[in-house]
């Protein structure tokens, strides 16, 4: 039987196509299961999309199937995308947060996220103009430049101190 940790180690080598972070550190992997068969091992990966309709899902699925499928003893790989539990920035590992910071992307603090299982009505989510520390110089002299970034999960901030723009992940 193939080791679950070995599969996770392979999954750690797969980068998210839109951010400088592995899919494991981004918190996309919910579960990994292995079933033995006469022909080899069948690997089941359950993953969470950051957003419904994320255009990178097919690419990530192909990368998982390809990389894990190359492991000795693996007969087949099945990837299933689920929306429950919903992905949130709280799932990003500390190593992932550091990698994002090094590449100029900040991440909201963990906790205080909306629990969708306890909400019975539509709840408006506003994008606040709270100052975010600049990942380049550390200054708090920053401002929201645009709530719309290069992907649906990011927004653009501007640092008045070092005059750099940077991305910040939305708290979902």
Describe these PLM feature segments.
Residues 50-76:
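Short, non-transmembrane amphipathic alpha-helical segments
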Residues 131, 139, 156:
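Residues immediately within or flanking Cys/His clusters that coordinate Zn2+
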Residues 146-156:
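Short linker/helix segments within small regulatory modules
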């Amino acid at each position: 039987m193939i080791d679950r940790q070995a599969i996770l180690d392979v999954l750690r080598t797969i980068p998210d196509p839109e951010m400088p972070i592995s899919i494991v550190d981004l918190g996309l992997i919910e579960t990994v299961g292995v079933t033995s068969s006469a022909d080899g091992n069948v690997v089941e990966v359950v993953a969470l999309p950051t957003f419904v309709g994320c255009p990178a899902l097919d690419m990530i699925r192909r990368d998982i199937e390809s990389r894990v499928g190359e492991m000795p003893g693996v007969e087949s790989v099945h990837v299933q995308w689920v929306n429950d539990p919903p992905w949130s920035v709280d799932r990003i590992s500390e190593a992932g947060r550091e990698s994002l910071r090094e590449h100029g992307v900040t991440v909201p603090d963990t906790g205080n996220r909306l629990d969708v299982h306890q909400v019975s009505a539509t709840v408006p989510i506003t994008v606040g103009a709270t100052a975010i520390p600049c990942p380049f110089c550390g200054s708090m002299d920053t401002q929201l430049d645009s709530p719309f970034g290069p992907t649906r999960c990011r927004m653009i901030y501007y640092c008045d101190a070092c005059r750099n723009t940077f991305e910040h992940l939305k708290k979902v």
